[in-house]
Amino acid sequence: MGTEEKMTRSDIDLNEPAFYNNRELSWLAFNERVLEEAIDERNPLLERLKFLAIFSSNLDEFFMVRVAGLKDQVKAGFNKPENKAGLTPKQQLRQISERNHQLVQLQDRVYTETIIPMLSQHGIQFLTFDELSDKQRSFLEKRFDHYIFPVLTPMAVDAYRPFPMLLNKSLNLAVVIKNKESDSREQLAIVQVPSVLNRFILLPCEDGKNQFILLENVISYFIEKLFKGYTVKSVSPFRITRNADLPIHEEGARDLLREIEKELKKRKWGAAVRLEMQEGLMDPNVLKLLLDVLEIHKNDVYSLQGPLDLTFLFKLYNRLIVDYEHLTNETLIPQPPEDLIGETNIFDAILKRDIFLHHPYESFQPVIDFIATAAEDPQVLAIKQTLYRVSGDSPIINALARAAENGKQVTVLVELKARFDEENNIQWAKKLEKSGVHVIYGITGLKTHSKITLVVRHHNDEIQRFVHLGTGNYNDSTAKLYTDMGLLTADEEFGIDATNFFNHLSGYSEKPQWHHLSTAPFEIRDTFLDLIDQEIECHKQNGNGHIIAKMNSLTDKPIILKLYEASRAGVRIELIVRGICCLRPGIPNVSEHIRVFSIVDRFLEHSRIFYFHHGGDDKVFLSSADWMTRNMEKRIEILFPIYQQSTKRRIIEILTITLLDNMKAREQNQFGQYRYVKRNPSEQPVQSQLTFFDMASRFSDSEAE
C-alpha cells in the first residue's frame, strides 16, 4: 500500500453523510422494489395486481407513522440533521415528497395502462357508467336504492355545520350543490363512501365476463337522490391520511391497557398528512377549501388518473383467484420439517436433538402442536410465552387458554404496543385473562419483540425444560407468507436461560447472566460488535474473514461503523437486507468489501441470520432483532447461537443459495441505487424461495418413499 493511499485511508471520516442512505429514502427504495414486482412480466397477472395493493398499504403506513413523525418534528421547531445522511426533517420531507410523487405516478400508470388492459383481455373489466348496458344500469339503480342509499350520510358544510372530522384513510366525495328554486350560492356537502360495503360491485353479464364497477362511481352517478331540490354541480372523490402514531405516556400510566385503549380512539382523528384526489374530477374551489381545512401543503396532495386507495385490490384478488387460478402463482404446500420426519411425539423428538424449522417451506404446524400438546399433556406444569403479533383466530391463543383451564401455570407477555395490532392484542389479552392466564402487558418504555416459548414438564422425577426460539411471530397466518426460522431445544442451559428471561420480564430481578442468549436492550449490540471485531482479528491472522448477515433492515450507526471498519480491514461482508439499509456498499476505502442484496418475492423475507466464518470455526446465530437502533435500544430482543452441526450446515446452505439468487435479487450500488442482479446466459436461473420449496418437497418425498 502506497503512502498516498495510506494517508487517504487514515484521513477518511466515516461519519461523512455521503457514506450513508437516509432511512426514509431507503424505505421508499424498498417500496419501489415492491412496485417492480407489479411491473415484472414474469409474475402472474393477479400477483402483479396484489403487489399494487401491497405498495399502497405500505405507503399508507409510511405516511401515518414516518411522514407524520417528521411533520411533528418540524412543527416543534426541531431542525437537527439525522445522524447518518445528515438531512434535517424539512429536507427529508422535501425529498420524500419528490420521490413519492414519482412512485405514485408510476403506480397509477401501471394500474391504468398495463394491469387494467391485461385484465380486460382475460374477461375481467372495470366499467364506467357510459359503458353500461340498460340492464346493468337498472340493476345498479335498484342496488343503490336498496343497499347503498340507506347507508349514506350527506354532511352539509356551512356556517352552522363545520367541516366534518373525516376518518383516517376514509374515501369521501365532496359534492357541490345548488338550490334549484333560488339564486343562492353554491353549497358543499361531504359524503363518505361506506367502508362497510364492498368497494367493487359485480355486474350482471351474459357473455361470461366478470364486469365490475367501483362503489364510488355508483354513488356519484345517483348522488342527486341524496339532495332533493338541488342540482349537483360537481362530485370530487378524495381520501385523507392522518397521523396514526400513538403517543403512549407509559411512565405516568397506572394502567397501560386502558392508556392504549384511550389512545387508539384518537388514532382515527390525528392531523392530516396526505390528501389524494382524482385528476380531472377535483373542483378547484373544493381543493382550496380542503387544503385550508385540513392544513395540508400542496406538496402533500397526490393526484391520480385511476381510482384512489388501491388496497381494495387485496379483496379483488381473493375474489378472482377462484375463477382465475391460472393467473396466480402455483400453490406451494408447506412440507413436514426435515428434523421431524418419522416422529410422532414432539417432546420425544426434541429430547433426541435440536429441531430446526424453516418457514414457510417447512410447516408452522409443529410450533402449534408444541403448545397444543403441552396444553393437554398432564406432565406439563407450566407454559410461558411472548406474543407480539398473532392471527385473527389463533390456535396458539386457544391452546394457551386451554392449558390454563387444565390447571397449568400459564404466563404470557402480550405486547400491547405492537403497532397497528394494539386493538387485536388487547382483545387476546382479555380473553387469556378470563381463562386464568397470567398476562403481562409489556415492559415500560420497551417493546417485547422477542419470540420465545418455555414449556416446563415433569418426567421420571425430573424437571424437563423445552424451549422454542424464533425469528418470526407466533402467527399461523403470516407463517405461510413470511420466511422465518425457529429452533426447538431441550438443552438444559437454554432452558435455564429461558426461565431467567421470563422471570426478568415478570418480576423485579436484575438482568440475568446468560449461558447462551444475548438480549436487547442490554448486551445484544455489544455481542454483535464483538463478533465483528473477532472476525477482523481472524482475518488479520488467516486472511479469510467472512460475514454474512440477513435481516429486514439495517439502520444502527455503531454497527454500520463497525462493518466499515471490518471492510477496511479486508473482511468480506455480504448483507441480505430486504428493506431499509442506511449502509452504502462499494465505496473505495470505506465499504469496498461489502455487498448489499435485497430480495423481494412472493414471500416476505423476515428471517434474521448472522454468520461469522471465525477462521473456519463457523459461528451461526438467529435473532428476533434487525440491526436497527430501535432493536438495540428500545426493544426486548433475543439473539441465540446454533450449536448443532447439521443445523449450522443447513443455515449456511440457505444463506449460500440466497446469495446465488439471480431472479428476484437486487444489489445496491455505492450511490444507494438498487438494480436487479444480472444473470449471465450461461448461468442457471436461481429463484431462492422456489429452490427452498423444492428442497423441502424433495426431502419430504424421499422420506415418504
From Swiss-Prot:
Among Gene3D superfamilies, the record links this protein to:
Endonuclease Chain A, Polyphosphate kinase middle domain, Polyphosphate kinase N-terminal domain
Q: Which residues bind ATP?
A: 58, 482, 578, 606
Q: Which BP terms does GO give this entry? A: polyphosphate biosynthetic process
Molecular function via GO: ATP binding; metal ion binding; polyphosphate kinase activity
Cofactor(s) listed in the protein's UniProt record: Mg(2+)
**GO terms under cellular component:** polyphosphate kinase complex
Q: What is its EC number?
A: 2.7.4.1
Q: What class of enzyme is it?
A: transferase
* Entry PTM: An intermediate of this reaction is the autophosphorylated ppk in which a phosphate is covalently linked to a histidine residue through a N-P bond.
The task this protein performs is described as: Catalyzes the reversible transfer of the terminal phosphate of ATP to form a long-chain polyphosphate (polyP).
PANTHER family from the xrefs?
A: POLYPHOSPHATE KINASE
Q: Which HAMAP family match?
A: Polyphosphate_kinase
Protein's name in the database: Polyphosphate kinase
This protein's species is Halalkalibacterium halodurans (strain ATCC BAA-125 / DSM 18197 / FERM 7344 / JCM 9153 / C-125)
Query: What taxonomic lineage is listed for the species of origin?
Result: Bacteria, Bacillati, Bacillota, Bacilli, Bacillales
